[in-house]
Each structure stands twice: as structure tokens, then as C-alpha cells.
């Protein structure tokens, strides 16, 4: 799961 900005959705995605 890394669709957000690195806050809640993609905390380890693309911050």
C-alpha cells in the first residue's frame, strides 16, 4: 500500500 503521500495511506510508499 503506497498510494498516498506517506501520511496514512502510503506511509511506506512514496512520501
Curated annotation (Swiss-Prot):
Name the UniProt record assigns to this protein: Antifungal protein Pr-2
Gene Ontology BP term (one): killing of cells of another organism
Keywords on record: Antimicrobial, Cytolysis, Fungicide, Hemolysis, Plant defense
Organism: Cucurbita maxima
Role description: Has strong antifungal activity against B.cinerea, C.albicans, C.coccodes, F.oxysporum, F.solani, T.harzianum and T.viride with EC(50) values of 20 uM, 20 uM, 10 uM, 10 uM, 10 uM, 20 uM and 20 uM, respectively. Has antifungal activity against A.fumigatus, A.parasiticus and D.byroniae with EC(50) values of 40 uM, 80 uM and 40 uM, respectively. Lacks antifungal activity against P.verrucosum var. verrucosum. Lacks antibacterial activity against the Gram-negative bacterium E.coli and against the Gram-positive bacterium S.aureus. Has very low hemolytic activity against human erythrocytes.
Amino acid at each position: 500500500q503506497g498510494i498516498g503521500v506517506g501520511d496514512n495511506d502510503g506511509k511506506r510508499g512514496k512520501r
